[in-house]
Amino acid sequence: MKRLILITLLATISLATAGAVEPKTFCRFVPERSDDFAWENDKIAFRAYGPALSASAENSGIDCWLKRVDCPIINKWYKENAEGKSYHKDHGEGYDPYKVGASRGCGGVALWLDGKMVISNVFREWKVVKSSKEESAFVLTYYWKHDRDSYKEDKKISIKLGDRLFKTESTFWKNDNIAIGLPIAVGVLRHKKSNKLSKNLDKGWVSVWEKLDGSELGTGVLMDPSRIEKHELYVTGKKLEDHTLLITKTDKNGQVQFYAGYGWKKAGGINTAAEWEVYLNGFRHQTDSN
C-alpha cells in the first residue's frame, strides 16, 4: 500500500512538473484585441496600441500590465478577457489597472518642440525581431505630421529575462531624412499630484511612486546621463497629462536609447520608493558595464 501511494505521489509530481510553465520572455501582435502589441518577461508586462485604435483616445503611450507570477500571462489574459474574465481585475496573477489614455504612460516618447510634447498616434507597422526564453525584441513603426513636416519613428523594443526595465532604441526621420539633433521627450505619467516624484540625473533616471488599489507602484525611465539635455516636469492640470520627462536629442544616427519599466509592491521584490530608486541606480551601473 505504501509503495502504491509513493508511486502515485511520484507520478503526480512528475505530471505537475511536466505541466509547469517556465519563465521566459514573450512578445506578439494581438489582432483579436484591437491590434495591441504586448511583451513580457518573468517580472513585467506591457502593451502598445495599434491601428484599430487610431480613432480612440489611446495613441503611442505604453501601458503597464502588473503581473505577480513569473510565468507568461499575455496569451492567457487575452484569451480569458475575450471569454469574459477581465484582465482589469486581479484574479491571482495580476491585472491592468494602469491608466494611459493619451499620455506617455511608462516610457512613451514625444517630439519636444517649443516647450511642448508633440505626440504620434498608434503604431502602423510591427515586426518581431526575436522571441526566445532569454530575450524578445520587436519593432513598432509610427508616422505623424506636424507643421507641414512629416515624421517617422522605428521603435525597437527588447526585453530580457529577469529585468524590471525594457530597452527602447528609437530611430527618427524627418521629411524622409534621418533626423539628427531632434529634441525628444521621454518620460512617465504622474496620475496624481500626491505621487512621489524622484530623479537622479547623474545616474540618468526619473521616477514616479504611487499608491494603487491598496498596493504601490514605481515607474521610471533611464538613459545615459550624458545624453540628457534637461529634466522637465510637464504639468497641465488636466487628467492624464502630467509627466516627469527627460529631454534629449537624437544622435548622429537619428537615434535615442533608454530603458523604462516598473516595480509593483504586490509582486514582491520592490516594496518601497527607496528600493525602486536603488534598483534604478544599480541598473544604470549594469548598462554602463555592457
Locate predicted features.
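Hydrophobic h-region of N-terminal signal peptides that target proteins for export
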Residues: 9-18
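Positively charged n-region of N-terminal signal peptides that target proteins for export
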Residues: 1-4
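Residue-level recognition of well-ordered beta-strand positions that form the cores
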Residues: 139-143, 156-158, 169-171, 187, ...
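Extended, loop-rich substrate-binding clefts of extracytoplasmic carbohydrate-active enzymes
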Residues: 86-160
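Beta-strand-rich recognition/accessory modules
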Residues: 19, 224-290
